[in-house]
Amino acid sequence: MTFITILIIVVFVVGYALIALESATHINKAAVALLMCVACWTLYMIHPADYLPGVTTDLLSSRINTIIEEHLGSISTTLFFLMGAMTIVEVVDQYGGFNFVRDTLKTQSKRGLLWRVVALTFILSAILDNMTTTIVMIMVLRKLVRDHSDRIIYASLIILAANAGGAFSPIGDVTTIMLWNVGSITAAGVIEELLIPSAISIFIPTLILQYKLHGALVEPDASTEETAASVLSGWQHKAVFVLGVGGLIFVPIFRYLTDLPPFVGILLVLAVLWTVTELFFRLSKRAKTAGDMGKRVSQLLGRVDMSTILFFLGILMTVACLEEVGVLTVVGQGLDHTFHGNHYLVTGFIGVLSSIVDNVPLVAGCIGMYPLQEAGAFAIDGVFWQLLAYCAGVGGSILIIGSAAGVVAMGLEKISFGWYARHISWAALIGYLAGIVSYYLLRTFVF
């Protein structure tokens, strides 16, 4: 390991610590992530020949630019997907589209609401992606829970439920999509064998953390729920909901049919929804006194939390730098050597690691390191691949910045890293380990 590589690791550790201590330093995590990203890539440029053997000096600059653009292009698909999904959910919410979901979940019991929210999130995240599910559920939650100290508990369990629900579905999480696309797992296999472990991984933390909630709910003020829905008819409200939520469900189908990245599907849904709502406002006589629809949508676009987007950019580009200098590969090889090929320990540790760094390069590294075999743990639907799908997905819940769902909730509900680590992480870890144990028992005695 070169001196430059060590410096890059030090920058990552220091930056990560500052992000974790945001509540103490009062420095926005997005600013730290961007500084960390630039510092790592600048260090990389000091002596790039160490990481690009065989590339001549006159071609180094061009090659590095290509590498950075490739990573940025890949990461941008996630960022545009997030921006599109957040805007769609905001539009649906403005038209009162989530009111019937709110009415379905409504109860006076705080703990009763928690179980309903967790169950719905778990189911939705198997169909939608984790980020979209988290955004939708938090928007609904804001209509039900006024107290922010209670709401961040609900939001934290939404993170856990979204990641758990995505782990047993071939389209529920980006890592399971990766494993499914390369043929490491099958849809039937991963659903059949990971459904119970995933359910256990969220059931136990919910059972534990429900005791943080006491008393009855106080409904939010009705005045805070004034939306654009007031100028539209009942069927138009329902049409907006069907187009918005149905469109989100359609995104993975669109991806399967066209092989285009998911963000293209999200942009399609946003474009259709935007066009339809403008037509509704144009046809509505009441809308003429309620403001211009174009202005409304422009305002909604302005509500996208750019600090969350930039935080994503900084973190993912930093991890890309760690990937380029070979740190993730070394970690993977070290794990295999340390745990002597014990798949439960290797994948279990990868899951814990995925709560610190992005799970996508970790899973990509594993796919590259361990080729498919005809039989054994590395066969299709083998123990290693199914455990990897579970651990990389659910393990990201241990720390709030370990998953896209966590980062989104962190930005939307202003949950601090420290608060989550103190109040949620330990319960998430217990659920995570319980899921692994249940998978072992099922694999040993049932399947």
Residues of each region from the PLM?
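Interfacial loop-to-helix junctions that mark the boundaries of transmembrane helices
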Residues: 1-4, 24-27, 56-76, 187-196, ...
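Juxtamembrane and boundary regions of transmembrane helices in multi-pass small-molecule transporters
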Residues: 4-7, 147-152, 168-169, 178-179, ...
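Hydrophobic mid-bilayer segments of alpha-helices in multi-pass membrane transport proteins
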Residues: 6-15, 26-58, 75-87, 237-247, ...
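Hydrophobic alpha-helical transmembrane segments
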Residues: 6-9, 34-35, 79, 114-119, ...
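Membrane-interfacial helix-loop connectors
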Residues: 40-50, 72-73, 124-161, 165, ...
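Transmembrane alpha-helix boundary signature
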Residues: 43-70, 86-103, 123-135, 321, ...
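Transmembrane helical segments that form the transport core of multi-pass membrane transport proteins
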Residues: 73, 95, 102-104, 117, ...
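Alpha-helical transmembrane segments
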Residues: 73-83, 189-205, 258, 262-271, ...
